[in-house]
């Protein structure tokens, strides 16, 4: 496979520049006959989850294609589902650069992007042009300058706009890079947000005559007590799925490595065991009442199997995909 050569060239560039360049090239391919260049024919391995049928259990995690510009290109690679975003109501530039760093020795990535995106209206236009026949998830967040107390309004604005086009919607309350966002994972703030989202979901279901499931994406840095509270809230509010987990603020496993002291969320192999443990504990707590989508450090068939064994119904990749490329998709889908 050509990917090791592509990776070698990309890894000579700054991490964000390489990311931009890759998306530019994939955007050129999307929706053209040239997608054949990256097409992988993979077996059909359907999984029913959240009331939807996924053509295979492997998805692309949110954050790679924030604006939904390369949906068809990623679809051609064989993903069973693709999650685009995080998108916010209004466009925003994100945090100052540099804001993405490869921790190569640990096969990790640190980012403090800060929900840089072109806004929900732009994303909707891109989704309308896509031809992907798998499940499309859309991950939504709040604008940086929206006070946390008013944060739920941002989620509702995004829901209104994406509902007709989404296979499922993910509520991102776990990015460490938007001030105050993670506070929405706790207690009354979480209950208030989830109640508003479920009410809006019912209204939109009546308006559009279709039910779009809601998933909540959580952090790996939750204590045992916090995790129990989150699980309780998810069940009480009849949330359709939970995505575990986002990036970690913990640096224990990369201490002393280059970029280890950079601020932001750490993803990739260093978060693998922690996210699997969260899935295991969450699964024990939820008892099958809310399905789990496992994400965090999956970089092989073995680590994908570990997430499933811990209680995940579906899995997603991001950092592992950066390090291993399309062959990782084939390895996991063919053998899982």
UniProtKB/Swiss-Prot annotation:
<comment type="pathway">
    <text>Pyrimidine metabolism; UMP biosynthesis via de novo pathway; orotate from (S)-dihydroorotate (quinone route): step 1/1.</text>
</comment>
<dbReference type="GO" id="GO:0044205">
    <property type="term" value="P:'de novo' UMP biosynthetic process"/>
</dbReference>
<feature type="binding site">
    <location>
        <position position="66"/>
    </location>
    <ligand>
        <name>substrate</name>
    </ligand>
</feature>
<keyword id="KW-0472">Membrane</keyword>
<dbReference type="InterPro" id="IPR005720">
    <property type="entry name" value="Dihydroorotate_DH_cat"/>
</dbReference>
<feature type="binding site">
    <location>
        <position position="172"/>
    </location>
    <ligand>
        <name>substrate</name>
    </ligand>
</feature>
<dbReference type="InterPro" id="IPR001295">
    <property type="entry name" value="Dihydroorotate_DH_CS"/>
</dbReference>
<feature type="binding site">
    <location>
        <position position="268"/>
    </location>
    <ligand>
        <name>FMN</name>
    </ligand>
</feature>
<keyword id="KW-0560">Oxidoreductase</keyword>
<dbReference type="InterPro" id="IPR050074">
    <property type="entry name" value="DHO_dehydrogenase"/>
</dbReference>
<dbReference type="GO" id="GO:0005737">
    <property type="term" value="C:cytoplasm"/>
</dbReference>
<keyword id="KW-0285">Flavoprotein</keyword>
<feature type="binding site">
    <location>
        <begin position="62"/>
        <end position="66"/>
    </location>
    <ligand>
        <name>FMN</name>
    </ligand>
</feature>
<feature type="binding site">
    <location>
        <position position="139"/>
    </location>
    <ligand>
        <name>FMN</name>
    </ligand>
</feature>
<feature type="binding site">
    <location>
        <begin position="318"/>
        <end position="319"/>
    </location>
    <ligand>
        <name>FMN</name>
    </ligand>
</feature>
<keyword id="KW-0665">Pyrimidine biosynthesis</keyword>
<feature type="binding site">
    <location>
        <position position="177"/>
    </location>
    <ligand>
        <name>substrate</name>
    </ligand>
</feature>
<comment type="subunit">
    <text>Monomer.</text>
</comment>
<dbReference type="InterPro" id="IPR013785">
    <property type="entry name" value="Aldolase_TIM"/>
</dbReference>
<keyword id="KW-0288">FMN</keyword>
<comment type="function">
    <text>Catalyzes the conversion of dihydroorotate to orotate with quinone as electron acceptor.</text>
</comment>
<feature type="binding site">
    <location>
        <begin position="246"/>
        <end position="247"/>
    </location>
    <ligand>
        <name>substrate</name>
    </ligand>
</feature>
<feature type="binding site">
    <location>
        <position position="172"/>
    </location>
    <ligand>
        <name>FMN</name>
    </ligand>
</feature>
<feature type="active site" description="Nucleophile">
    <location>
        <position position="175"/>
    </location>
</feature>
<dbReference type="InterPro" id="IPR012135">
    <property type="entry name" value="Dihydroorotate_DH_1_2"/>
</dbReference>
<comment type="similarity">
    <text>Belongs to the dihydroorotate dehydrogenase family. Type 2 subfamily.</text>
</comment>
<dbReference type="Pfam" id="PF01180">
    <property type="entry name" value="DHO_dh"/>
</dbReference>
<feature type="binding site">
    <location>
        <position position="217"/>
    </location>
    <ligand>
        <name>FMN</name>
    </ligand>
</feature>
<dbReference type="GO" id="GO:0006207">
    <property type="term" value="P:'de novo' pyrimidine nucleobase biosynthetic process"/>
</dbReference>
<keyword id="KW-1003">Cell membrane</keyword>
<feature type="binding site">
    <location>
        <begin position="111"/>
        <end position="115"/>
    </location>
    <ligand>
        <name>substrate</name>
    </ligand>
</feature>
<dbReference type="InterPro" id="IPR005719">
    <property type="entry name" value="Dihydroorotate_DH_2"/>
</dbReference>
<feature type="binding site">
    <location>
        <position position="86"/>
    </location>
    <ligand>
        <name>FMN</name>
    </ligand>
</feature>
<feature type="binding site">
    <location>
        <position position="297"/>
    </location>
    <ligand>
        <name>FMN</name>
    </ligand>
</feature>
<protein>
    <recommendedName>
        <fullName>Dihydroorotate dehydrogenase (quinone)</fullName>
        <ecNumber>1.3.5.2</ecNumber>
    </recommendedName>
</protein>
<dbReference type="GO" id="GO:0106430">
    <property type="term" value="F:dihydroorotate dehydrogenase (quinone) activity"/>
</dbReference>
<feature type="binding site">
    <location>
        <position position="245"/>
    </location>
    <ligand>
        <name>FMN</name>
    </ligand>
</feature>
<dbReference type="GO" id="GO:0005886">
    <property type="term" value="C:plasma membrane"/>
</dbReference>
